[in-house]
A protein has these predicted regions:
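Catalytic nucleotidyl-transfer cores of nucleotide-processing enzymes
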Residues: 180-182, 189-190, 391-529, 791-794
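Short nucleic-acid-contacting surface segments enriched for D/E, G, S/T with interspersed K/R
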Residues: 80-98
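Structural detector for short beta-strands of small beta-barrel domains
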Residues: 35-52, 133
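OB-fold/S1-family single-stranded nucleic acid-binding modules
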Residues: 100-121
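Conserved "right-hand" nucleotidyltransferase catalytic core of DNA-directed polymerases
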Residues: 125-126, 139, 247-257, 262-458, ...
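Conserved DEDDh/DEDDy metal-dependent 3′-5′ exonuclease domain
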Residues: 149-244, 259-261, 289-294
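OB-fold (S1/OB) nucleic-acid-binding surfaces
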Residues: 51-78
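C-terminal, non-catalytic extensions of nucleic-acid polymerases
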Residues: 509, 578-803
Length: 803
């Protein structure tokens, strides 16, 4: 594991992303509003619907055949003359129109009608400006603003500080580029676009930060102007802040010393002092008075800066901080590049335009499937009917799921929680699917996993459980995605041509998987166009009924190890029983319509249904749960996970693994103070406290003289939480769970700070592994694991499974 994460092949994939992006329809100019005048257009949307006030209307959208610009307007039915003019206008109608604007609203007159065509014009994708990928970030103060852009390929920086003209020139020279940010769709993009339109960036920034009303933000500038093509790395990866990702990746996570709430322009105090012959050697009060006089800043504010040794170059510090965030975003971009290419690929496959890339995966999926938002149907709790062909024997299951309407839980959704005690495991059925497992279980020998292929997507198509918000003429799309994914999966081609772009087959498969795996969740999201809680419930229940049906058929011939949403792991009693299960599985496939994979394994070490290590027949290691650190994303105490995995499945002594490890990033422990707390403080060995940042990188150390302790503070509140002490009226909660006895903070880039390998307390990390072993396998863990190792003919490779 490198001190700073590296992602080989990222630049090649970024080039492919840019190629796909450039082939999506649209350029910056084509998304500008259609200008007043006479235009040759084609109608690309003609939809009758109700207005927000319930009035009958028709939404018309036309596209210029010259430059691809669009105009959208609404014809109200009660305006009889207008309605008569537009009532029979349909999609594909060619028109010559005159466009005028009245208070910003388009007024369209038809000059001439042409033929109706089938092939609607796409927006031109030829770039009219420089086209590249920019990584960017912005910092906005009340009287200061900073924009930092970095060309991903040339690594050239563009820094724009308090210069609106320069920002507009940069935009006009690069508007056909792809802009990558972190939380940029909600924040950076809106602030930048509003600023270019002459709005106050600070006011827009505050509205975004302080208000939950998105509509308020969009009223502050014209969302139809200054289009910015972008992808937001935060959008579909909620849960971790950019600072946390920076910490996991090993780079500098120091927060800026500049106060974002300051009510003045940023100042280079060193320059001011030099210009006016002032020195920090002067008497503090005299220096304060002089600086206040020459800058015009309130004397109390200046005094705090003088006393706090904060007379720094604020502009440079802010630029350094912003550049550091851009570099962090760039590294996260490289880490996530595969998903971004998959997203762009599916947009290209469906012929969407460049703005589709700024959508969340859920909204993009709704767009692909043509979903139209509907009123709630109120049928979620209706009685469930088991599909034909299913064979459930359990009366307990029938009573819980098929006897009548469902009860409503506290969130207003159907309550479907049930525990069923079986011979080997207790099966838990609920909104998360079927789950059950033998706890603290170790087995060495041949066993199988029967895994249902694409359980939820196939449930939707087999039983017509797709969202009812998908129009009839789009119902085939979901099945087509399933079919095309399977076709690509079994293709022997390295690349497949999609609209003139050669896409690596693996990336195309991931592109198809994106909407397939997103649809189920979107059907339960109230603000998504696919929202259909009844169909989502039917998918959830039917998937569990299918798995329970299969469970009942396997049980007489095998020991069940675990059930996990779409699979059963089991040990056949004999070779004959294994053959019998194969026969029953084929019958199950025929009855239900699903397909089953049969994956062979040769060892499993299982804490519970959500935490296990398994060795496949070909010696690969499959792991699930916290030990995997969010699939290697959350690099915190990685050496503990790696030592644990290598000891349990590969027989490598965990003490030796840790003592031999010379990779500092494996030893980092990342702590974060959540939003429910007011402050983070650090206490040194002498009991002195000072304010600390929310995200910190700490290491266990041997020397107590350098140790500190982090606390999360709730002001004026008494909290009853483990690890919490009361200090006056405040609650102090330990900021590092399972903390070392002694630790220090080092928020510099790993390898450039104060921590070195010789300072580490490696015994702490060894003890953490032993705590995990007890948690998984009990106090006799050593005997159990050594017994398992004695039965293993060969071990998997010793390596960093978290890397």
């Amino acid at each position: 594991m490198k001190n700073i994460a590296e992602f080989k092949g990222a630049e090649k994939l970024a080039s492919k992303l840019l190629e796909i992006f450039s082939n999506l329809s649209g350029n910056g100019k084509s998304f500008d509003p259609m200008i007043e005048g006479v235009h040759q257009v084609v109608v690309i949307k003609a939809e009758e619907r109700l207005s927000a006030k319930g009035k009958e209307m028709k939404e018309i959208k036309v596209r210029s055949t010259n430059d691809g610009r669009d105009a959208t307007f609404y014809i109200m039915k009660f305006r009889k003359q207008d309605w008569k003019t537009w009532e029979k206008i349909e999609v594909g109608q060619q028109l010559t129109i005159t466009l005028k604007y009245n208070n910003g609203f388009p007024n369209v007159t038809i000059n001439q009608k042409g033929e109706v065509i089938d092939n609607l014009p796409e927006k031109p994708n030829k770039p009219l400006t420089n086209q590249t990928i920019y990584i960017y970030d912005i910092e906005v103060f009340k009287k200061d603003n900073l924009y930092v852009f970095r060309d991903y390929f040339t690594k050239e920086w563009t820094v724009i500080h308090n210069d609106l003209d320069a920002l507009r020139k940069f935009y006009l020279a690069n508007r056909d580029s792809l802009f990558i940010g972190y939380n940029s769709h909600s924040y950076d993009s809106n602030v930048m676009r509003a600023h270019m339109q002459g709005k106050n960036p600070y006011h827009v920034s505050k509205a975004i930060i302080d208000s939950d009303d998105r509509g308020l933000v969009y009223k502050m500038f014209d969302t139809k102007k200054t289009p910015l093509f972008g992808m937001d790395l935060y959008q579909d990866n909620r849960g971790f802040s950019l600072k946390e990702h920076s910490a996991f990746l090993g780079i500098n996570i120091k927060e800026t010393e500049v106060d974002f709430d300051m009510d003045r322009e940023l100042i280079n105090w060193r320059e001011v002092m030099k210009e006016h012959n002032l020195s920090e050697e002067m008497d503090e009060l005299t220096l304060t008075d002089e600086l206040a006089r020459v800058t015009g800043i309130n004397v109390d504010i200046v005094y705090k800066l003088v006393m706090g040794n904060a007379l720094v170059d604020e502009k440079t510090l802010n630029e350094i901080y912003c550049k550091n965030d851009v570099l962090a975003t760039e590294l996260r971009f490289e880490q996530n590049i595969g998903m971004l290419v998959a997203k762009a690929t599916i947009a290209l496959y469906f012929g969407l335009d460049k703005t589709a890339l700024s959508m969340t995966n859920a909204n993009l999926t709704a767009e692909l499937l043509g979903a139209v938002k509907q009123e709630e149907r109120g049928d979620e709790l209706d009685k469930y009917e088991l599909p034909e062909g299913f064979d459930i024997e359990s009366d307990e299951i029938k009573k819980a799921f098929m006897s009548g309407e469902f009860e409503q839980n506290e969130k207003g959704n159907a309550s479907i929680a049930l525990e069923v005690n079986r011979r080997d495991v207790t099966e838990v059925l609920g909104v998360g699917g079927i789950h059950g497992a033998k706890e603290s279980f170790i087995y060495v020998g041949d066993f199988n996993a029967r895994d249902v292929g694409s359980l939820y997507p196939n449930t939707m198509t087999l039983f017509n459980y797709e969202s009812r918000n998908i129009p009839e003429d789009k119902k085939h799309v979901f099945q087509m995605l399933l079919d095309e994914r399977m076709k690509a999966k079994y293709s022997d081609k390295e690349t497949i041509n999609v609209r003139g772009v050669e896409i690596p087959t693996k990336l195309l498969i991931n592109g198809f998987k994106l909407p397939l795996n997103t649809t189920y969740g979107a059907m339960g999201a109230a603000f998504n166009k696919l929202y259909d809680p009844r169909m989502r419930l039917l998918v959830c229940i039917t998937g569990q009924m299918a798995l329970f049906d299969l469970l009942e058929k396997i049980e007489p011939y095998a020991t069940i190890i675990q059930s996990n949403t779409d699979a059963h792991y089991y040990i056949p009693f004999s070779d004959e029983d294994a053959k019998k299960i194969d026969e029953l599985a084929k019958d199950w496939e025929k009855r239900t319509g699903y397909t089953l994979d049969n994956d062979p394994f040769k060892a499993i070490f299982q804490k519970d249904v959500n935490n296990y290590l398994a060795v496949t027949a070909d010696g690969k290691v499959k792991f699930k749960g916290a030990i995997g650190l969010t699939n290697g994303l959350k690099v915190s105490k990685a050496v503990v996970s790696n030592a644990f995995i290598n000891y349990v499945v590969a027989g490598k002594d965990y003490k030796d693994f840790i003592n031999e490890c010379d990779e500092l990033r494996q030893f980092q422990i990342i702590s974060k103070t959540g939003w429910t707390f007011d402050d983070t403080v650090v206490r040194d060995v002498d009991g002195n406290e000072h304010k600390a940042q929310k995200v910190n990188r700490v290491f266990a150390i041997k020397d107590p003289s350098n140790a500190v302790e982090i606390f999360k503070v709730k002001r004026g509140s008494i909290m009853e939480e483990e690890g919490t002490t009361i200090v006056g009226d405040d609650s102090y909660t330990k900021g590092v769970p399972n903390a070392p006895e002694y630790y220090l903070i080092d928020n510099d880039t790993i390898g450039e700070g104060t921590i070195t390998l010789d300072k580490l307390d490696k015994d702490y990390y060894i003890n953490q592994v032993e705590d995990l072993l007890v948690m998984w396998f009990g106090t006799n863990w050593k005997e159990r694991i050594e017994n398992a190792h004695s039965q293993m003919e060969e071990f998997p490779e010793v390596k960093n499974y978290i890397d």
